[in-house]
């Protein structure tokens, strides 16, 4: 029996199933679409101003403060302890949400929820430490799909219970507490990884290429962004550099290894962001994600402002379910659309940023709750479609380690931007704007993003046309020779 359990645990199926079960129950939270009616209702008796200006900003600030330390800690302790910590934070969040009272307690709730969101990196990174590379794509798809399915199922369940069974919002939170508690139990059964991406990367793998050749200096393959060639994790580089063997690596002090890892991170990020293509897609990712998170934080308050939950039937659960499902379908469809994203990608950023701005303006100006719901559906679906394209454009030429770094830094920059918006627009120490005016600001924000990338798209189109005119009289030129004027146009040469 022990042999069977050991062989099962060592395969990729067992950790994938356990992780997916954790992901499902941690995201199956039917109380989520009805959080604002619960907080402003008789259970908590909080005002809209208290929720908007005093409670919700705490999540943004705590997420920003915790993200980078948790990102480093996740790799250092090899993922599982941070996943368990996330499960504990989930339970504390919902216990306080159920039985706590007052603004201060709800601010503590937001702090622990910031811990939950900061620890999400462990859920997505864990699988790369226990699954062989040939299963990465499949398993990553499972993990992401199950969270979308769980969120959709939770939203549908919530709407059915509220509309048909007239269930109290309090009991929706009881169901959420039970669900996240089950997720915590599943986290205890995850196998402990023997390696991680950076601090505990295995140094004993065979190196196919000669260690005397620096991969950064090798000729870039056609279609790869300069400086973003696939590179080995730090500890593997140390062990294969000809200066340190495995025994010497093990004898290094942990502080030295930590410094080496941070130095390698800095070098990797510097090389990756030197690619203009990756830089501009990352720029859109950071700015758009900041705006998207801000809208998600406060959209329920806007709905409650347009149609108060005490006076009318609300359909937040149905809207969230449709929006999530529609976004997932749009993101899935991207893989089957034959488009040269290198040529039209930034134009797509312009078009959909305009769509996002228009949907937010609609949500601000309309007095009809159904039009407000429709604007949100359009906004969320278009963002999920574009973020899928952006992730692919960024990750296509990066290995897992470099993608994790770029993802972490992009998320951190998005949080910095979101924090600045929160301080200026939302916080009581800033402008303290009412929620309806906030959405006018967010719509203007996406309009500015569209304007920036419109100018960038026009510049690329003009540069490409000029370059073709220059190259056409000289067809005998060596196509492998890089021209100085092509540097700003490097995205045109990428193969998908």
UniProtKB/Swiss-Prot annotation:
One of the GO biological process terms: thiamine-containing compound metabolic process
List GO molecular-function terms, semicolon-separated: thiamine transmembrane transporter activity
Topology term for the membrane: Multi-pass membrane protein
List locations, semicolon-separated. Answer: Membrane
Gene3D superfamilies for this protein: MFS general substrate transporter like domains (1.20.1250.20)
Q: Which residues lie on this side of the membrane: Extracellular?
A: 29-53, 103-110, 166-169, 304-316, 364-375, 427-434
Q: Which reaction does it catalyse?
A: thiamine(out) + H(+)(in) = thiamine(in) + H(+)(out); pyridoxine(out) + n H(+)(out) = pyridoxine(in) + n H(+)(in)
Instruction: Show which residues form the site (Essential for pyridoxine transport).
Output: 86-87, 91, 93-94, 168, 173
Q: What would changing residue 86 to H do, according to UniProt?
A: Significant decrease in pyridoxine transport
> Which superkingdom heads the taxonomic lineage of this protein's source?
Eukaryota
Chain ranges passing through the membrane: 8-28, 54-74, 82-102, 111-131, 145-165, 170-190, 283-303, 317-337, 343-363, 376-396, 406-426, 435-455
Q: Cytoplasmic compartment: which residues?
A: 1-7, 75-81, 132-144, 191-282, 338-342, 397-405, 456-496
Q: Which disease is it linked to?
A: Basal ganglia disease, biotin-thiamine responsive: An autosomal recessive metabolic disorder characterized by episodic encephalopathy, often triggered by febrile illness, presenting as confusion, seizures, external ophthalmoplegia, dysphagia, and sometimes coma and death. If untreated, encephalopathies can result in permanent dystonia. Brain imaging may show characteristic bilateral lesions of the basal ganglia.
Functionally, this protein is described as follows: Mediates high affinity thiamine uptake, probably via a proton anti-port mechanism. Has no folate transport activity. Mediates H(+)-dependent pyridoxine transport.
| Protein's UniProt name | Thiamine transporter 2
Q: Which organism is it from?
A: Homo sapiens (Human)
